[in-house]
Structures are given as C-alpha cells and as structure tokens.
Swiss-Prot record:
PTM annotation: May undergo proteolysis by metalloprotease sup-17 to give rise to a soluble form.
Domain Ephrin RBD: start-end pairs: 21-178
Keyword set includes Cell membrane: yes
SS bond list: 53-91, 79-167
Region (Disordered), start-end ranges: 207-237
Name used for this protein in its record: Ephrin-4
One Pfam family, short name: Ephrin
Main location: membrane
TM region(s), chain numbering: none
Membrane topology: Lipid-anchor; GPI-anchor
GO MF, one annotated term: ephrin receptor binding
Phylogenetic lineage: Eukaryota, Metazoa, Ecdysozoa, Nematoda, Chromadorea
Other notes: In contrast to other ephrins, does not seem to signal through the vab-1 receptor.
Gene: efn-4
Family as reported in the entry's similarity comment: Belongs to the ephrin family.
Species, as recorded: Caenorhabditis elegans
Length: 348
C-alpha cells in the first residue's frame, strides 16, 4: 500500500512538471553512456531523472541484476560502498506478487488488460527539487553534484555485492550536476524617448496635471502632440511667452552680431517697469506733503512747543532719484525773547 501511494504522488508530481525536461538513464552495461571515461549528465532544478533497470524478460539468459546506489565522490572513485550509501533502485529478480502489483499499476487495474500486457523494465523517477513532498524523499540543491554507481556483479547471486563489480568492470558510474532552474523569459518594455512620449507617471511627478490622453489605459505608449498640449509644462519652447526680448529687438541683435559688432542690450520689459516705478512715486517722503507741513509749522510757531525740524529737499533729475534731508533745531521764539531780555538787564 505504501508503494502504491508513493506511485500516485510521483505521478501527480510528474504531471505538474510536464514542462520540465526528463532525463532517462538506462542502467545496463550496453548503454554507450558508460563508455565515457567520466559519465556525466547535467540537469536543472525541476527536471526529472529516470533510472531504468535492464530489460530482464523471462527466459533470457543474459539478464543483468543489480542495485543502483547514490554515493559520495570518494566512494564512486574507489567503487566501494559506504555505510550511508542510499539505494536508488533495485533491479533484482522480481517475485510473482511484485510483478502483478506493478503490472496492475501500469494497466490501470483492469485484470483482463494486465494479463496480456508485457511488463516493462522497472524504473524509478528522481524529482530534482529542493522540497520533496514524498516522505524521506531525496532533496537536491542547485550547484551540487550527485554520484551514482552499482557494485553488483550482474548475476542474480551477486546483486548485493558491495565492492567493484560492474562499477569497475563496465564503468557503470554516473555524475549528475544540478544547476539552477531555467529562467523564464522576461518581457521587455518598449524603449521610449523622453522627448517623444509623455507618461502618466511623469505628469504626476511634475505637478499632478495630465493632458487630454491620460484616460487611455495605453496612454504611456501613445505619442503626444506637444505643440497642442493643454499642460504648459509639456509645451515646446515655441509656445512659451517671451522673456522680454521682442522679435524686432532679437533680429536687431542678430544683425549686429553678423556685422561683427559687440555690446549689450537691455531687457525692454524690465526697463519699462523701472521707468514706471520712478514716474509713479519716490521714497521716502512726498515733497509737496513736507512743504505744506513746514508752512503750517511756521504759521503756528507761537502756539507750538519748543521743538521744530527744519527740512531741506534735494531733487536730482539726472539720476531720476529724489531724496530728503533734514536738520533739527531746539530753539523757539519764546526762548529767544527771554534770552534777549536777560542780556538787556545785565547791560543796564
């Protein structure tokens, strides 16, 4: 029953690995693979390696009976089993019950079919996986090499032989190199130039504004008409307002440059703004207001307390700058009159 459940689990795993590669190793002395000095196969994670026993039909006198072991590199080089060597498959003479069970599994359990069906050679599949759902199943790691061999003599009575055997006489040993799984091909996004395409993401980074095609799901693949874009951030320089250099002024500069002349020219907008500010007013105080204030101060001198400022106004037309200077005096009319009386009293 245990073997039946392991067979079912293996079958489902193989169905799930239909896209993986399957490597079949016919483990018999006539396989040309063992003619190489160092028999080696290369597999990837997710592949399946199937070891197939020799085809020992009933009545054949040249049948081979053996056991395949997973061993260390040192044991494979010496063709000698170690205590922890793992048995992979036993290609020994099968009993009647074992043949019947295996034939039923292959024929789907129908009695009338398995009696007529030829029994195929015994085989076992090794799933090259890092995690194996089968209890005590072998787990493999990428980048590692695993070694297999048989020390059986090939005869029925020499199946359990633990040294030399077919490993030495027929070079029946194998190195299996495991590499990483086949990488899946990645889809590369189409290459876009910044000046030809505008994406929704770029619009968000530049202020959260999008143009008229942003509602399209494939908007990032559509070329935009930058001349007619509603977003000023995506307009061409021809759409932007001038920075104060008018066309006539620019053409004049070009003509001067072609004639070999040098010099500077003033930004017209800034010049106009500066003249307008000078015409509208000046700082710090309005001249007419100060003049009126002074006249009122002199007319009411007798009624004011003894502190009055004398102002002097300057206007420099050549620099278009108006300034205001002042000097202070702490004398008043009443104070001067008192001093005059005191002087007359002393003299007389």
């Amino acid at each position: 029953m245990k073997q039946f459940f392991e067979f079912l689990i293996t079958t489902f795993l193989l169905l799930g690995l239909a896209a993986a590669d399957e490597h079949i190793v016919y483990w018999n002395s006539t396989n040309s693979l063992f003619r190489n000095r160092q028999p080696t196969i290369e597999v990837r994670m997710g592949d399946v390696v199937r070891f197939v026993c020799p085809d020992n039909e009933e009545g054949r006198n040249d049948g081979e009976y053996l056991i395949v072991y997973e061993v260390t590199e040192f044991a494979m080089d010496d063709c000698a089993l170690e205590s922890h060597s793992r048995e992979v498959i036993r290609c020994a003479p099968e009993g009647t019950a074992e043949k019947v069970l295996r034939t039923q599994q292959l024929s789907g359990g129908r009695r009338e079919d398995w009696k007529k069906q030829k029994v195929p050679p015994k085989n076992v599949a090794q799933l090259i996986r890092q995690l194996n759902p089968i209890p005590n199943g072998k787990e493999y790691q990428p980048g590692q090499t695993y070694y297999y061999m048989t020390t059986s003599t090939g005869k029925a009575n020499g199946t359990n032989h633990r040294m030399y055997g077919l490993c030495e006489s027929q070079n029946m040993r194998l190195s299996m190199k495991v590499s990483a799984s086949q990488p899946h091909p990645t889809r590369r996004a189409p290459t876009r130039r910044q000046e030809d395409f505008v994406t929704t993401a770029s619009a968000e980074l530049m202020g959260g504004q999008e143009d008229e095609d942003s509602d399209n799901d494939n908007a990032h693949l559509l070329p935009r008409d930058l001349e007619g874009s509603t977003n000023p951030k995506f307009r061409r320089p021809s759409q932007l307002e001038t920075a104060g250099v008018e066309n006539q002024q620019f053409m004049k500069v070009v003509q001067m440059a072609q004639a070999g002349k040098t010099g500077t020219f003033e930004n017209e907008k800034e010049a106009i703004a500066q003249k307008s500010s000078e015409k509208d007013g000046w700082h710090p105080v309005n001249v007419q207001y100060v003049a009126d204030l002074m006249n009122n101060a002199y007319q009411n001198a007798d009624e004011r307390i003894s502190y009055q400022r004398d102002f002097e106004i300057h206007e420099e037309n050549d620099l278009a700058v108006k300034s205001l200077e002042y000097s202070s005096s702490s004398t008043s009319l009443s104070t001067n009159f008192a001093i005059l009386l005191a002087v007359i009293y002393v003299l007389y």
